[in-house]
Design a protein with these regions (language model features):
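Outer-membrane beta-barrel proteins
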Residues: 1-309
Length: 309
């Protein structure tokens, strides 16, 4: 009986060693960031001061065939909300799967407009939808593929299937960087997450950098099945690098609703400044006619201090 026990313990120890040999080490990273936001007196948005509260765990390894496999988990506010598995196959492109799996399909083409702080359509306001912006596939169960070709051409596709409520999302994107200083982009997609009405997005963008200036323009059409309120978005912006430490920018977006709604208008100025390991970024933004509702407006002033260590 003792010999049988010893044999069992030896086998168990061997299996544990074998498992450990195939495990990947994860590194953890976080950030030091303190933000302050001031909005309209009638806005109720909780605490004005906030801090960065996310920790990202990453790991990667190279396979015998030269491919690189990587994994990422983000712990945000005490919850794991962003996970991604990626397989980089070199000249054959890369696959990625996970939640909040951005950067594939129409995402690579949906915003060519430069910003110093954040995209203007997400800077201010209480909209739960960024109107006039291309819809990408849902976060959960998102499968993406991207391939960089010779000559500066990159193509990408993403897909997601909601198995509980039905609905399939498929989007596609392409960018071209073969002209010095210029990026051209186009994307299209059909999203129907959760079995709701299908939403068709089509977008075209251009970005051009010369000297310290970067200019961007994005034209987007969003059509929702069964709705008369289709969206035509015009998004533009310019940034200027005054020097290596100081950058300023102006951004604007206008969304025309094809029905009787008023045009939604976002605008703002942004700036960033760094001195050694300390950096600041901020914005002053406003939105008029939120979600097409005449007279519904909001403004905000926001600044973030970050320390790298």
């Amino acid at each position: 009986m003792d010999n049988i026990k010893k044999l069992g313990l030896t086998a168990l120890a061997g299996s544990m060693v074998a498992t450990a040999a195939h495990s990947a080490e994860l590194s953890a990273s976080g950030s030091w960031a303190l933000s302050y936001t001031s909005e309209d007196d009638d806005a109720v948005n909780g605490q004005a001061f906030t801090m960065g509260d996310s920790v990202t765990f990453t790991g990667s390894g190279e396979l015998d065939n030269g491919f690189t496999a990587s994994v990422k988990y983000e712990l945000d506010g005490g919850n794991f909300d962003d996970e991604q598995l990626k397989l980089d196959m070199g000249d054959m492109g890369e696959f990625a799967y996970g939640e909040s799996n951005s950067g594939y399909g129409i995402d690579i083409a949906s915003n060519m407009v430069p910003a110093v702080d954040t995209a203007i359509y997400s800077a201010v306001g209480t909209d739960t939808v960024s109107y006039g912006v291309a819809r990408s596939a849902q976060d959960t169960g998102n499968l993406g593929y991207k391939l960089a070709l010779d000559g500066g051409l990159t193509v990408s596709v993403e897909a997601a299937r909601n198995t509980s409520a039905g609905g399939t999302d498929n989007t596609y994107g392409v960018t071209y960087t073969g002209i010095d200083g210029m990026t051209l982009a186009a994307g299209t997609g059909m999203t129907a997450t959760g079995g709701t009405a299908e939403v068709e997005s089509t977008t075209f963008g251009v970005k051009y950098a010369t000297g310290g200036f970067t200019f961007g323009l994005q034209l987007t059409d969003v059509e929702t099945e069964g709705s008369t309120e289709d969206e035509d978005g015009v998004h533009m912006g310019v940034t200027y690098n005054v020097n290596d430490d100081f950058t300023v920018g102006y951004v604007r977006q206008e969304t025309d609703f094809s029905g009787n709604s008023s045009d939604e208008e976002h605008s703002g100025i942004q700036a960033s400044y760094s001195m050694g390991s300390i950096s600041f970024s901020g914005r002053v933004s406003k939105v008029d006619n939120m979600a097409g509702t005449a007279g519904s407006s909001d403004e905000d002033k926001h600044i973030t201090m970050s320390i790298a260590f």
